[in-house]
Amino acid sequence: MRKKVLLLSFLFTLSFGINSQTKSYKRGVAYGYHSVKDMENASKNISWWYNWAAQPESPIRTTYQNFNVDFTPMAWNNIGITGVGSWADKDSTIKYLLGFNEPNFREQANMTPTQAAKAWPALQKIAQKHDLKIVSPAVNYCGTCVTEGGVTYTNPFKYLDDFFKACDTCQVDFIGLHWYGAGNSIMSYINDARKYKKPIWVTEFASWDNNSRVPNVNEQKKYLAGTVNFLERDPDIYRYSWFIGRTQGGINTFPYIDLYGANGMLTELGQLYMDIPVYDPEKKFEIPGRIETEEYYLMSGLFCEPTSDKDGFLNIGWTDAGDWAEYKIFVKKNGTYNLTARIAGSGAGRIDLLVDNIFIKTINTPNTGGWQNWADVNSELNLTEGDHLLKLRVRAAGFNINWIDISNTTSAKNEIEIIDTEVYPNPVTNGIVNVVFHRAQSGGEFTCRLFDIYGKQVFLKNVNVNRALFQINLNETNRIPAGIYYLNISGENSTANKLIVVQ
């Protein structure tokens, strides 16, 4: 039940097929003290929550349906089954039931596999009465564990194995897991759970490992970003919920896990949780264009972390030989394209490129002097018009990848200048943004576009610049709501990108 991290550099990608969804069906929160304002704010980005109880917490018990967020009742142990049945009789909007809470822990539900199996038919009867699906007992590795028949159930999968043996005809539609391990350890944990061939709910997770303690909230952010991106994009993960909304100590106290701050407000960690891109399996990157590597279609073995590169949001890393990531692409026309991969690493590596599972070439990656010391690696790629599947396969490990840019060879002659740009004030308080170009020639015609974190354009203005400093009024047409935005300023063969916060 815990994890790890880096510093965040928040520039959001613009690419073909940007996800039109505003919130993930998978994403939820494990928390039992929501206020109306808490739920109103969180409901923009979460689709469900639970509180370890049979019914919603009292402040939102009769109104939560107004927020389009599912409540999922839990039978914490066998005693909780009656309460779940009573609530299911009252609330016709529920879809799922959660089984027992960490029954292999003596300090939690404290039920042996046989005891859990004996109690299960009562929960199953409720599900069948109301046409609901059931999540298995939620398990994890324990310290003080239940024992039965000479077996101490430290291993959660041994517990589930014996539960299923004792309950072989029971209705169990999903596997329930908790996890607090550090780093990318959740990947191997999920891989172990795939053997049951059922969709998975991860109903508690955070980096909270006393053997590998997160030192600060920035490290927790790094863990959250990589883990949520993995869970969001894994097809075997049905739903997940971060632990927890609030703690008594607050976000600046170990283990630094609070999503909520003051009433109705998000912490920085909470905002990051809400902002992780929603997975769209139909998304295609348009070529020519840029592929942000964390937005893969399918992946094996790789893990993401926040990048400190000059642009990008997350990079993929934790590379081992045989790891791979796939991307759906749409190529506008036949041609030989320039390929630029943004690489960082402490050793030389190699990447195989495959198109539609046909090997095309191998790219060698250099030692850049560090995992966040970024450099461009250039090559060429022949592509035909239409839909394709581009696969990156790690031949030799030792590198991170931020993005891959695939551009026309003809356009390479007119190199795009990245303008060194200063934007202030930031945060923006009254809609007025001052832009300063730090370059020899600042004049020309430029198009200013503002995008929200989902890639939706919310502002457009053409400006004729005749000096290094100019102003943009973001509220010129409509008032821009508070939030995080991506400002793009493009001219002939030049561009500038800045992340801004509007208050």
Regions found by a protein language model. Name each.
Residues 4-14:
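Sec-dependent N-terminal signal peptides
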Residues 25-97:
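N-terminal carbohydrate-binding/catalytic regions of secreted carbohydrate-active enzymes
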Residues 51, 73, 101, 156-210, ...:
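Aromatic- and acid-rich polysaccharide-binding/catalytic face
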Residues 68-72, 234-291:
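Aromatic-rich peripheral "rim/lid" segments of glycoside hydrolase catalytic domains that contact
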Residues 91-113, 134-145, 170-179, 202, ...:
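Active-site groove signature of glycoside hydrolases
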Residues 135-148, 196-224, 243-261:
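Active-site clefts of carbohydrate-active enzymes
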Residues 280-409, 426:
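Extracytoplasmic
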Residues 416-424, 428-503:
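C-terminal outer-membrane/trafficking sorting elements
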